[in-house]
Amino acid sequence: MSLTRLLIRDFRNIETADLALSPGFNFLVGANGSGKTSVLEAIYTLGHGRAFRSLQIGRVIRHEQEAFVLHGRLQGEERETAIGLTKDKQGDSKVRIDGTDGHKVAELAHLMPMQLITPEGFTLLNGGPKYRRAFLDWGCFHNEPGFFTAWSNLKRLLKQRNAALRQVTRYEQLRPWDKELIPLAEQISTWRAEYSGGIAADMADTCKQFLPEFSLTFSFQRGWEKETEYAEVLERNFERDRQLTYTAHGPHKADLRIRADGAPVEDTLSRGQLKLLMCALRLAQGEFLTRESGRRCLYLIDDFASELDDERRGLLASRLKATQSQVFVSAISAEHVIDMSDENSKMFTVEKGKITD
C-alpha cells in the first residue's frame, strides 16, 4: 500500500497540514528546525503509535494543545483504507480504521510496513542487542501472523517471572510460569532463526553492493546455549537468576551479530560505512518482505545527504527506485535530492511548520 493523503493536526510544530502524496518519491526540503523531520515522524507515528525522536507524548503534541490528530489514506491494489490516530497528553490513544474505532496500533503497523533511516539509526549496529532484536522482530511480525501475540505474552510472563524471583526460594515455585514461558520462548526463537536464515542471502548481496571492500557475516544468537533445552537452562540457572532478580537467559537476550572481516562492525567501519551498512540492511529487509509477501515497504529517510558522498547517494537512490516503494526523503537543500526526482515525484517545501508543494 502507498500513503496517498496525510492530514496532520497539532503534531510537533505543525498546526495543520493536508498533503496529497506521490506513490513514488516525496521530498521534504527545508532548513533545520523547519518541520521536515516532523512530517516523517508524523508518518512513522501513524504506523507505530509513537514518535521516533521522543517517547514523551508532551513533546510531540503542539505547544498548549491537548492532543494530536493524524489521518491517512492508504491505496492498495484492490482497495483504499482510511486510518487515523489520536493521542492526548495522558497518553491515551484512539485508533480508527475505515471509520470504526477500537482498533489496535498493531493493526496500523501491519497495514503500513515501514523502514526508518535516520542519523540516529546507527544504534542498529553500535547499540545494544535490543536494537538488532527489534530488526529481527520487525521481520517476524510481518511474516508470522502469530508472532505479535506470542511476543506480547512472552514479555508479560518474563515480567511476572522476574517479580516471582524476588519471593520464591525453590525452583518448583517457578514452574507455573516456566510451563507457559518455555514453549513461547522456543517458538519465538525458531521464528527468529528462520527469519535470519531466510534473509541472510539478501543482506549479504545488498551489503556486497554497498560495501564491496568488506566481507560481512551475520549470525543469530538465540539467547541461551546451543543444543540445550531452554527448560534445562532455566532450572540450572535458578539460583543465579534469584540473586540477580531477573531471568538471565532467553529470547529477550537474543542478538544478531554482524561482523566485517571477522571483527565487530562498530570497531571496523567508519561512520559513512556504518550508514551504508544500515541502509543496506533496511533495503534488504524491505525487499525480502516484498518477495515473500508481495507487500512493499514505505521508506522514511531523514537527512538524506549526511555521511554519504555523491556516488553512495546515487547508489542508494537507484536501489530505492528499483523497489518501486513509496519513499519520503528530507533534505536541507533541493540540490541534494534533485537527481532522484522524476515526473512522478513530489517536492514539498517546509518552513516554520508550514508545508507547500
From Swiss-Prot:
Primary localisation category: cytoplasm
InterPro entries in alphabetical order: DNA-binding_RecF (IPR001238), DNA-binding_RecF_CS (IPR018078), P-loop_NTPase (IPR027417), RecF/RecN/SMC_N (IPR003395), RecF_2 (IPR042174)
The keyword DNA damage appears for this protein: yes
A Pfam match: SMC_N
Residues reported to bind ATP: G30, A31, N32, G33, S34, G35, K36, T37
GO molecular function: ATP binding; single-stranded DNA binding
Subcellular location: Cytoplasm
A GO biological process held by the record: DNA synthesis involved in DNA repair
Keywords of this entry: ATP-binding, Cytoplasm, DNA damage, DNA repair, DNA replication, DNA-binding, Nucleotide-binding, SOS response
GO CC terms in record: cytoplasm
Role: The RecF protein is involved in DNA metabolism; it is required for DNA replication and normal SOS inducibility. RecF binds preferentially to single-stranded, linear DNA. It also seems to bind ATP.
Family (UniProt): Belongs to the RecF family.
Matches recorded under NCBIfam families: recf
Name of this chain's protein: DNA replication and repair protein RecF
Native species: Escherichia coli O6:K15:H31 (strain 536 / UPEC)
